[in-house]
Amino acid sequence: MSLQRIVRVSLEHPTSAVCVAGVETIVDIYGAVPEGTDMFEVYGTPGVDIYVSPSMERSRERADTRRWCFNKGLEIIVIMNSPSNDLNDSHVQIAYHSSREHLPLAYAVLYLTCVDITLDCDMNCADRQDRSFVDKRQWVWGPDGYGAILLVNCDRDNVDSNAQDNCDQYVRCLQDLEDMSVMVLRTQGPEALFEDHRLILHTSSCDAERARVFHVCGPEDSCESYKCVLGPDRMSYEVPRLKGYEERFFVEGLSFPDAGFPGLISFHVTLLDDSNEDFSETPIFTDTAVFRVAPWIMTPSTLPPLEVYVCRVRNNTCFVEAVEELARKAGCKLTICPQAENRNDRWIQDEMELGYVQAPHKTLPVVFDSPRNGELQGFPYKRILGLDFGYVTREPKDSSVSGLDSFGNLEVSPPVVANGKEYPLGRILIGGNLPGSRGRRVTQVVRNFLHAQKVQPLVELFVDWLAVGHVDEFLSFVPAPDGKGFRLLLASPGACFRLFQEKQKWGHGRSLLFEGVIGDRRVQTVSINQILNNQSLINFNKFAQSCIDWNREVLKRELGLAEGDIIDIPQLFKTEKRKAVAFFPDLVNMLVLGKHLGIPKPFGPIINGRCCLEEKVRSLLEPLGLHCTFIDDFTPYHMLHGEVHCGTNVRREPFAFKWWHMVP
């Protein structure tokens, strides 16, 4: 609502004023007071509520029909709650009295015309328009909060277009309107009032760059009826009275929250008095509606899968077939990027992250395109952006990116509670270097974007010890039927050495790793005895374990985890240019499709006809109701320093929890 309006009355002639339903009007009686006045009466026609505040120290009281002492600091407050039928059809009369005179000294008359003006939108996030209980100038988080929500219209509903829907000032297809939020300007009052009063819809120059408003100026089933009235370089619009009582607008977001933009956008409608030809217009009333741009939200691996993505390259036919079978078991769609489009870039996890945006009226999947820009660079924009599938990207202006800017280094935890604070949408995990070091970090534009979304606060882990440098090289999350509903899997050199020592103790020291590997290059086998006698390998894995232990403590602290929430998965690393790479296929770098896990086949020592690494992993995960499928990724992925998770991507169901119910 606007602030109170002040109207001054005159003893020489009646005064006319416009008031807005439900908005207080202060009547200034000090400018025209007969000499000798020490009391006054004030009364009005039916429908006019009048209050008197005798002084700054006393609360207001109904004026009723009694006389009031004329004191310094008193106020007369007038409120009308229903719009007028005609101009000046209500009035307030003030009678000035002297205690020494029987009759009033003078009268002042204020004629009132009441209009009802509201800028309405979905304020309570329940898919209905309601303005009865909230301050539209505010946006409040939480289950009892309120505020309008705006989607960035970043999909491509028009099949004849090559651009996102919000890239121009036109509505190209009616389906595009489903991605927008409705804003309604309602006006009630005498039609004659608007002959010399104007309604202006306006916003700030900054907000005009972040949202676009379309006015419905004709039949709603015609794209030509939607006129762009606010947006870049358009900050104000005189609203014509096309439909009288109600004018409808559709609002689309142009920008996600980011550095310097917290996500709030305000629109205002102002009633201007243009009745005096000798003076400029004067504002009477302003109503405001505030929208928050919906954040981009990541989905953890514990949410149900909807669609799996994989690249077909020269030497991964069996891998693609295995992923296809796993997707079939999990009941989700499979999308294969052909070699002609990926040009042998198989790292589809690194190229993009699949998330969503949500408003009460619409949920929209949105792909976040990484700045790595390999041969898969065009795939998210050309093949995923489309009907009801949005797109966003962030790239540094100087084009300087590192391996940490690939999205294998971008994960999100399931919902957690840590240090007394709830994170109902989990926390984003990114990899970086140690505090104070000069190693690699995620580029600032990506960090700024992720931080600005607010609903999944960042946790930075230490990954600069890894050659590739991705968080998915040493951790993953799987669903669990008990406890927190998930387990954190951590790669563990210590667990692997303990397993091999146990097998050696039972006489299996000569059992070989890498037997049966088929590929373009011969892979030399190595025995358990050789591994346990390789002091250089042991020392390097002690270093790797210390790095993982550092991250373990960070994860326990920042995600509120106990040791019982963590499962150690046997894994060894080897050194390459002073950094770590997986010694055998990295078991935690898995594809999680509900209860079905696609795990890199480790080609571990065969004992009693079975791989002891596979058997150990099964013993850890199958009691949780999970089904382990070991996929041979050795030649097409492992030998290139990646695994199953690196070579796949998953679109998942959104959270059931609504982001606007949380308190960041």
Swiss-Prot record:
Spans traversing the lipid bilayer: none
Cofactor(s) for this UniProt protein: Ca(2+)
GO cellular component, one term: nucleoplasm
Keywords (A to Z) from UniProt: Calcium, Cytoplasm, Hydrolase
UniProt xrefs under PANTHER family: PEPTIDYLARGININE DEIMINASE, PROTEIN-ARGININE DEIMINASE TYPE-3
Biological role stated in the UniProt entry: Catalyzes the deimination of arginine residues of proteins.
Name used for this protein in its record: Protein-arginine deiminase type-3
